Amino acid sequence: MSNRVIIFDTTLRDGEQALAASLSVKEKLQIAMALERLGVDVMEVGFPVSSPGDFESVQTIARTIKNSRVCALSRALEKDIDAAAQALSVAEQFRIHTFISTSTIHVESKLKRSFEQVLEMAVGAVKYARRFTDDVEFSCEDAGRTPIDNLCRMVEAAIHAGARTINIPDTVGYTVPSEFGGIIQTLFNRVPNIDQAIISVHCHDDLGMSVANSITAVQHGARQIECTMNGIGERAGNCSLEEIAMILATRKNLLGVETGINAKEIHRTSNLVSQLCNMPIQSNKAIVGANAFTHSSGIHQDGMLKAQNTYEIMTPESIGLNRNNLNMTSRSGRHVIKHRMEEMGYSEQDFNLDALYEQFLHLADKKGQVFDYDLEALAFMEAQAAEDNFYQLQQLVVQSDSTEGVATATVRIDVGGEIKTEAATGNGPVDAAYNAIARATDRRIDIISYKLGAKGEGQNALGQVDITAVYHEQNFHGVGLATDVVEASARALVHVMNLTCRADKVADYKQNMHKNRELGGV
């Protein structure tokens, strides 16, 4: 048996079914090209018979993708197969994926047919699809709840009809690993022509078992896993591609199989899918979550500084990240503070570690996470100055033209004791507020992340805006709270402006410090 596991991505078909709004053809093509760079073997990109838009997107992707095999879904109906074949005909290599329900509840309640009739439809669909390509995949929908005798008969008949891949879906995420592995094992034991097809699995996450079930299936002989980027999909989602890829890579010593995935593209592809699908990734998501390579415990941080593999079983670089994060919080020890200062280029004679650590703990207790620029400010500025706000937003007035989409914002800001009033227009109220604040502070920043949330519940909830901005090639993080979203955005912007102002003062101090050294001063 081959030790190569085929990665069948269905982000653009099953994954898209979870979205509140459909992706455009251009967005689907962007994702398809990213999946090709990632190295997926097969990408299922739509259901052509379902709509003209889906047909167009499948055809566009089929015409563009060269290295991955492009696949389209069809029911066990000739009109579906015709549409799939027509949309895929421009591809260099393609697959038709046809399916029918096989569980008793689906056969009787949904299809309202006998199992024998369904078996006949399945065989007919596979034979018809083979007229267009020799790469036909057949799926037994709801295989996880299908009586095993019926499942064995269906699989044998589909292979005999010409299916090269047989997919065994846990459509409703019902099975547990021991049970699902037993199904795969039984198929290998009882289906006489099983060696003439690749066994595939397609697991859903309703009980949180999709990845575990897929791995168990591989251990029992499955050699294709159907999955989606970030695990998006119907209901609770699908088996997560990034988790599967990294499990098989990290535990190759146990599982003895490999994929063709270029793992260094995982982070970039995950972010693209998250942004285009408007589905944020939870921070604690395995592999691609913001906290996946972040360490906050002082004990863990100490271990990481001594040997990275004490608390990391894979490296952030392996998925395309630059490095891990040692979050500086009140749980961090002196060694972490010393390490961060040294990484920023300071020697021990530049700062008093004991005094700095005491100030750090005071700030961390108030603020939570402390960033590098906070640490520098504590080291080189008086504590009071490090926390002062040079810019203070006193008033914000916004007017919007609903017909033109242009907004005007007027701000009154205290700039180091001097009151400044500025007005500006923008593409919407937040953009206008930013332009007005930039005028008043005479500072320009590039916003690279904008997140809107809420603090509190019901009518008492406050809008919370978190932004990340770049200033002089350094990232700064601002937070704003207000009952109004635009005001919260403005406060977050002013917060960042204050941080950049403080950073400039620290830079001046450092420059003077270096000059004094060169002159032989203290």
Swiss-Prot record:
<feature type="region of interest" description="Regulatory domain">
    <location>
        <begin position="392"/>
        <end position="522"/>
    </location>
</feature>
<dbReference type="InterPro" id="IPR050073">
    <property type="entry name" value="2-IPM_HCS-like"/>
</dbReference>
<dbReference type="GO" id="GO:0005829">
    <property type="term" value="C:cytosol"/>
</dbReference>
<dbReference type="GO" id="GO:0003852">
    <property type="term" value="F:2-isopropylmalate synthase activity"/>
</dbReference>
<feature type="binding site">
    <location>
        <position position="204"/>
    </location>
    <ligand>
        <name>Mn(2+)</name>
    </ligand>
</feature>
<keyword id="KW-0808">Transferase</keyword>
<keyword id="KW-0464">Manganese</keyword>
<protein>
    <recommendedName>
        <fullName>2-isopropylmalate synthase</fullName>
        <ecNumber>2.3.3.13</ecNumber>
    </recommendedName>
</protein>
<dbReference type="InterPro" id="IPR002034">
    <property type="entry name" value="AIPM/Hcit_synth_CS"/>
</dbReference>
<keyword id="KW-0963">Cytoplasm</keyword>
<dbReference type="Pfam" id="PF22617">
    <property type="entry name" value="HCS_D2"/>
</dbReference>
<keyword id="KW-0479">Metal-binding</keyword>
<dbReference type="GO" id="GO:0030145">
    <property type="term" value="F:manganese ion binding"/>
</dbReference>
<keyword id="KW-0100">Branched-chain amino acid biosynthesis</keyword>
<comment type="similarity">
    <text>Belongs to the alpha-IPM synthase/homocitrate synthase family. LeuA type 1 subfamily.</text>
</comment>
<keyword id="KW-0028">Amino-acid biosynthesis</keyword>
<comment type="pathway">
    <text>Amino-acid biosynthesis; L-leucine biosynthesis; L-leucine from 3-methyl-2-oxobutanoate: step 1/4.</text>
</comment>
<dbReference type="InterPro" id="IPR054691">
    <property type="entry name" value="LeuA/HCS_post-cat"/>
</dbReference>
<dbReference type="GO" id="GO:0009098">
    <property type="term" value="P:L-leucine biosynthetic process"/>
</dbReference>
<dbReference type="InterPro" id="IPR036230">
    <property type="entry name" value="LeuA_allosteric_dom_sf"/>
</dbReference>
<dbReference type="Pfam" id="PF00682">
    <property type="entry name" value="HMGL-like"/>
</dbReference>
<dbReference type="InterPro" id="IPR000891">
    <property type="entry name" value="PYR_CT"/>
</dbReference>
<keyword id="KW-0432">Leucine biosynthesis</keyword>
<dbReference type="InterPro" id="IPR005671">
    <property type="entry name" value="LeuA_bact_synth"/>
</dbReference>
<dbReference type="InterPro" id="IPR013785">
    <property type="entry name" value="Aldolase_TIM"/>
</dbReference>
<feature type="binding site">
    <location>
        <position position="14"/>
    </location>
    <ligand>
        <name>Mn(2+)</name>
    </ligand>
</feature>
<comment type="function">
    <text>Catalyzes the condensation of the acetyl group of acetyl-CoA with 3-methyl-2-oxobutanoate (2-ketoisovalerate) to form 3-carboxy-3-hydroxy-4-methylpentanoate (2-isopropylmalate).</text>
</comment>
<dbReference type="Pfam" id="PF08502">
    <property type="entry name" value="LeuA_dimer"/>
</dbReference>
<feature type="binding site">
    <location>
        <position position="238"/>
    </location>
    <ligand>
        <name>Mn(2+)</name>
    </ligand>
</feature>
<dbReference type="GO" id="GO:0003985">
    <property type="term" value="F:acetyl-CoA C-acetyltransferase activity"/>
</dbReference>
<dbReference type="InterPro" id="IPR013709">
    <property type="entry name" value="2-isopropylmalate_synth_dimer"/>
</dbReference>
<comment type="subunit">
    <text>Homodimer.</text>
</comment>
<feature type="domain" description="Pyruvate carboxyltransferase">
    <location>
        <begin position="5"/>
        <end position="267"/>
    </location>
</feature>
<feature type="binding site">
    <location>
        <position position="202"/>
    </location>
    <ligand>
        <name>Mn(2+)</name>
    </ligand>
</feature>
